[in-house]
Structures are given as structure tokens and as C-alpha cells.
Amino acid sequence: MPLARLPGWLCVVACGLLLLLQHVHGQDSASPIRNTHRGQVRGSFVHVKDTKSGVHAFLGIPFAKPPVGLLRFAPPEDPEPWSGVRDGTSQPAMCLQPDIMNLEDAKEMNLILPPISMSEDCLYLNIYTPTHAQEGSNLPVMVWIHGGGLVVGSASMNDVSKLAATEEIVIVAIQYRLGVLGFFSTGDQHARGNWGYLDQVAALRWVQKNIAYFGGNRDRVTIFGVSAGGTSVSSHILSPMSKGLFHGAIMQSGVALLPDLISDTSEVVYKTVANLSGCEATDSEALIHCLRAKSKQEILAINQVFKMIPAVVDGEFLPKHPQELLTSMDFHPVPSIIGVNTDECGWGVPMFMGLDHIIKNITRETLPAVLKNTAARMMLPPECSHLLVEEYMGDTEDPETLQAQFREMLGDFMFVIPALQVAHFQRSQAPVYFYEFQHLSSFIKHVRPSHVKADHGDDVAFVFGSYLWDMNLDLTEEEELLKRMMMKYWANFARNGNPNSEGLPSWPVLDHDEQYLQLDTQPAVGRALKARRLQFWTKTLPQKIQELKGSQDKHAEL
């Protein structure tokens, strides 16, 4: 019945109810409130650039107690409940990290960083949902783990809102302890280490308990990350502590076998931290007690030494070395996307590691000394450096070619070969989709040397539709199509464990045909990525090293 034909008093009541409902809906749209198992949180509506839509953002939700005092170098504990409605409209503080590394990289890339504070109290997560999402929506969930060598990074460094809005997905971006506070280990019961990984487990457990309140499906969780974030994802696949906490995994330029991010022993880091801190090194319990008393500034001073810091085999999160766990097929059989970029060590990684000036000065004359040092860093006998020359440099005298081949060698060793190895192990238990991102991004090439192709991390901009710290992307029409395609692949995978759908170029599963997807403005299916290099690193080189050791042993006996 039309309102005009209702009795006067009933018309007033009906109109009042309509106005109330509109007010409540408008209020929820602008300042949505959601429950968690520890209390309520108020978010905000955030308009998504270059779209007509937006998301609800709930920022700085605690998933653990502040890891301070006795909780420094200790497993995370559940957060305390709060009364009233918690404000979730501002970014949380970043975990303690060497800020100078961020600033130097930012200057090189012409990035303007937002003013985000740092604190040891940093175990928070951000949630981005489509505006219609509410309890019962049952949307797929993606949990983003940032990269940064396990020493830098934050939940705010990547703007995930466009992916959430465009693809109707709930996205959670988490933080975890970094550097010494995140990964220092005494190698015994006093401080087993891997605190940052344990923080990630705590965040995934929080998601299982709470994500339904935000419209997410706890039984359809995909974890994804780049670089050290990809290494983290890969490590969760291997960890018994992460069982049942996720159902799909995406590893972008990072897996658990990355050489600088995993170690059998904590000895080197232990001695370095003990020396820098001035704490007694002979007694691990006393050392931890001493380190817990150090100020924020003293911890930051120690952190400055580490460009990267390795996780350790702690017997709990990682029961054995990742290589052993993969070889014995002791991992969670979940569908995976694994990928690398064409030029992994083209620019960003060497600069981050302080190798860019060394590479720029490589000539045929300086090459032997550089390779000898590099072999030592790779934990290879210095005598085998000539094998690296034969495989990558050959007889060329041209400095630019030598430098390019050196960068390729680094990229293969650090990223490509480990990714291929992990993919080959995992495909026996669950589907694996492999990619190589090949596109030279127009929006960043003007700040890089001309030799750089698809550099480490370039694919992330096309997954999220934004670069670091929401840097504006001025994409070409072809790049816009590539962005939409990659967002759709990632979202399809989050929905059903398969990136394919109608209208997209077919992405074959990685089987014994070794097919993979070449991601570019003209995508294509490739076969047997770097097969010769894989053979060199996994068979030829180890065999030659064994022969070298055998001949040295015989010589020693004589």
C-alpha cells in the first residue's frame, strides 16, 4: 500500500522507521562497527582510487599482546579484551626496523613515505572488506604478509584496497616482529627464535576466530606474500604449527629455500648480537635477560647491522631444515601459485644488500676476486668460482655483459632456482601454478638504470593496482589490462584454488611438461623455465663440489 494511502499516524511511524534505517545504513557505511572475540572495532569507508567503489577499512586491530618486557624474545600471547568501541581508522605503528634503509630506497625510487611511527608494540593487522560485507557474507579471504628481508616492512606499505573492492575479497594485512626482535635465537630453550613467524601464526589463528564477523570465510583463506613474505608463506606450508590455518598459498619471488633467510644454526647472529650489545655471551639465559633490558634505541643500533636476518630451525615452527621437510614430503598439501620475475637482481636487491657499487665495477680483471667473495657468501668453496664463470660469463671481456650475467647469477641463486625446486616438490602433493613476470613497468623505469627489466617485486603493483605506499601508477592501456588480468587470476585462486576462469588466457598447472605462464601485456605459456640453470645448480655444481672435496681429501692424505 502506498504511504499516501496509510492512516496519518501510521504514515508518520513508517516514515520515521525509513529515516532511521537510512540513518543507520549511512552510519554503518561511513563508520562501520564489527565485533571481534576481544571487543568491538570501528572502521571507516575508504574510496578506492580510479574506481567508483570503496572498501571498509579496519586498521590497527591487535592480534596479540604488545611483545614488550618479558614478552620480548617470547611467543606472542592473546590480546587483552577491551571495553567500548576501539578506533580502527588509523594505521598502526610499524615494528622496529632500521629506518635508514627505507629512506635510502625511497629516495632512489622517488617515493614519498607517509609519516608512520615505529614501536615495539606493533602486533596489529588491517582488514579491508567490500562495503556490503557483513557476518554471513562468506567471502574468500586473502592474508598478505609483507616482504623486506625479515628486517623491514609494514602492513601499510602495500595498498590492498583496490583488490578487495574490485574482486569482492576480504584482505587482511598483518605485521610481525622484525630483525633481532623477530628472529634472534640462542639456539636453546631460553630463546628458540622465529618470533616473527610465531606472530604470523598468531595472526592466522586470529583470522580463524574472527574473520566471519567481517564477512570472510574462515574455510577459504589464502596466504600470500612477496620476497620475505613469500618465504614466510612457504614456511607456513612446512610448519606443523600452521596446519589448518589456510587453504591456498601464493609465493611471489620468495620461498623457504631462499639462502639468506634460513639457517641451520643461530651461531653467527648470536655472536654478532652479543658483541654489539655488550651482553655476556657465554650464558644464553643471562644474554636474553640483558637484551630484554636494552632500550629501543639500543635495539635499533644492533638492527642496523643486518641487511637480512635468517629464520632458524627451532624444532617447533620449523622441525627440520626446509630442504629436509620438502624432500620427505612433510608439508601441507595446499594448491599454490609460485613465481619469479625476469630480472630478480636487476636493481633493487643489489642496492638493498649494498652490492650495487661492486657490480658496477666488475670487469674481467676484477671478476675473480668478486666471484671468490660471492662464492663464500653462497657458502660455496672459493675454488668452485671458476665453475660459476664457465656457466654464466664464458669468455666475454665486455664489462656490461659481465655485469648483466653476474646479476642473472645472483637472481638465479637467490630466487629462481629455489622457487623452481619448491614448485617441483610441492606439485607431487597439490596443484602448483608457476609464473615468470616479464613486464618492464612504464611507471618505474624512469628512475632505474636502462638495463633493468622486470625487477624484484614489480609484479606486486599489478596484483594490487598500486605501488609502495600507494604511489600513483600511470599505466598504459596495455598495462591496465595486465593489471586486471593478474588481479583476476589471484582472486580466482583465492576463491577456488585455481587461477583460471572464462575470458582469461589459460594458465596450465605445472606438471612434467614444465609449463608455466609468462605474465606480460601479451601473456604466453612457456616451457621448462631455466632448465639448464636448474640442472647446473642442483646437479652439476654439487657433483663438481663433491669431486673437488674428494681430490682435496686425497691430497691431504698424501
Swiss-Prot record:
SUPFAM superfamilies: alpha/beta-Hydrolases. Glycans are attached at N275, N361. Belongs to the type-B carboxylesterase/lipase family. GO terms for cellular component: endoplasmic reticulum. Disulfide bonds join C95-C122, C279-C290. Its main location: other. This is Pyrethroid hydrolase Ces2a. One of its GO terms (biological process) is protein glycosylation. It catalyses: (-)-trans-permethrin + H2O = (3-phenoxyphenyl)methanol + (1S,3R)-3-(2,2-dichlorovinyl)-2,2-dimethylcyclopropanecarboxylate + H(+); all-trans-retinyl hexadecanoate + H2O = all-trans-retinol + hexadecanoate + H(+). It is found in: Microsome. It comes from Mus musculus (Mouse). The modification N6-succinyllysine is found at K209, K296. Residues 1-26 form the signal peptide. InterPro entries: AB_hydrolase_fold (IPR029058), CarbesteraseB (IPR002018), Carboxylesterase_B_AS (IPR019826), Carboxylesterase_B_CS (IPR019819), Type-B_Carboxylest/Lipase (IPR050309). The lineage of its organism: Eukaryota, Metazoa, Chordata, Craniata, Vertebrata.
